[in-house]
Amino acid sequence: MLTNDVARETASKLVDLHPDFVSATYSAGGSKNSNATSEIAAILQDELDMTAMAHLTCSSASEEKIASALDDLQEKGIENVLALRGDLVEGQTPSTRFKHATDLIPLLKERGFCVGAAAYPEAHPTMMDLDEDLKYLKAKQDAGADFFVTQLFFDNECFYRFWDKAQAAGITAPITCGIMPVMSKEQVQRMVFMCGVSLPGKIVKILNRYADDPASLRKASIEYAAEQLIDLAEHGVDGLHLYTMNKPEIAQQCMGLLRDSWR
């Protein structure tokens, strides 16, 4: 469980990297609790002077619950929200008011939030194909999304194909690329199962070569992620977002490799 004290200690190690923003996920406090998320976002913003982006999911939420969550965010001075549908867990009842992120985004805009939304370079697993998924992406933009953050991907070529198609579909909002270094073979298997991400041959070789050597796997994966980031930056993407899973050393090491490449 990520307590406020652990969040404070973890995030403090990112301050010297000067990130444009830091995410507080909707389950950051150890449960799907919007107050826990807003508390961590407030720590980022008020104590560490970093721009916070709070995640907010709506798939099982009532209008009253969302209104309460937005009140709490505004009271704490949080201005940036990533609007997500979220996945239902066993025992939860689907919301009748919020079926998609497009139902949540207009409420956030009415409240004056800067709103981000999710993008899927390889299409959301529930979509037939990327073309269908791009229709939903455009709907999020039309609903008021100011920017997008992508699901993680390991193959930059998948992103470049998506980027071209998104522009052709009328997407003008900035798209920030989400990159996550893999820390274990099990983690990758979960991502492939849950998100449908593809694995380039190079990352498969890394996983197989270092399956029984966690330290070497970690080092090789961070180097691979840094190569992705460098290539994306050279292609002039709108932004880069590292999914560190509360491991600040991942961001520190990736940034070190990026800076070395730019010298």
Residue ranges with predicted function:
Residues 96-121, 169-222, 227, 258-263:
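Active-site pocket-lining/capping segments in soluble small-molecule metabolic enzymes
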Residues 58-71, 95-99:
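Glycine-rich anion/phosphate-binding loops
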Residues 15-40, 87-96, 145-159, 244-248:
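Glycine-rich, proline-tolerant flexible connector loops at the mouths of alpha/beta enzymes
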Residues 1-7, 52-64, 116-132, 209-223:
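Active-site mouth loops of central-metabolism enzymes
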Residues 22, 73, 140, 144, ...:
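Conserved, mostly hydrophobic/aromatic
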Residues 11-18, 38-49, 70-78, 106-110, ...:
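Acidic (Asp/Glu)-rich catalytic clusters
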Residues 126-148:
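Active-site glycine-rich loop that binds ribose-phosphate moieties when present
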Residues 159, 248-263:
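C-terminal helical cap(s) of enzyme catalytic domains, especially alpha/beta-barrels
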